[in-house]
Amino acid sequence: VEEAGLDDPWELYEKGEWTWSTFMEMARKFSDPENGKYVLDGYNPEDSFVCTTGTPLVSLEGGKLVSHMNDANIEKCIDMLRSFDNTQEQLRYPRDTENSWTPSYNEWADGNTLFFEDGSWRYEETWRKFKKKNKWEDDEVNFVPFPQMDGADKYYQSMKQDSIMLVAGAKNIDGYKAWIYSNLVASNDPEIAKAGREQSKEEYDWSDTLLDRLDTMKDPKTFSGVFDFKNGIGQDIATKDNQDNPVEQLTKGPYMTGESYTSFRATYQGQIDARLAELNKTVE
């Protein structure tokens, strides 16, 4: 970031200036396809970007699945993402042509990709190893939330919910209750949190700065959460494992091909709406 003459994204975030327009300005300044420089890599950045509009493609409202494929902000967001393709402004790492559709950790580590979309586990599994190998300073690896939509009333981010399910017919109900309770106690115990923080620093090379930022981003009060149910309407038309399915094509299609969102929507909307109607009918 510093070598490219760019502002620190985290500092922009803290000042309330980390927005789509700021991000796009940075993207165009950094990207240089002729010299292998790109702004973004990762498996599904388009999904997280859509959630910054505050509206998911498919929401759950009053117990029913609701489509928002015609939402103007979603269309605006995906049109922005369309510009990343190599048929447009060439802002994303061309993993489809350069790396067999796989994101490149090495290109990021070599400073050729500015942002890499992934979870915090990627630091422990991959980035810290580059840090050790290359003897980087602590501030060589950082992260930032997805930018806020310009003019948004709140700062929205994609969120998900992890659940511990009780299987029908389970025999050890008391054990299930004890597991739930122990998780609840552990999550609210400051001594356990402190011990976990020290373990993260000692075993996984986290710094206090990164852990502080991670705590900020994980705090439910920091952002307004957006839950997208688009991948829960059937493996045949909605799964991240196959980008050619109808639901994934709505977001990944424009990002990876440069074709318009409206063209993908026209192709798949009827099929998706029919599935939502089918699922909603089962709970009437």
Regions found by a protein language model. Name each.
Residues 1-13:
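Aromatic-glycine-rich donor-binding/catalytic loop that engages nucleotide-sugar donors
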Residues 12-15, 57-76, 133, 149-155:
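Short, solvent-exposed loop/beta-turn-alpha elements that line the ligand-binding surface or hinge
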Residues 44-45, 118-127:
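Beta->alpha turn/N-cap motifs
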Residues 131-202:
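Extracytoplasmic/periplasmic substrate-recognition and gating elements
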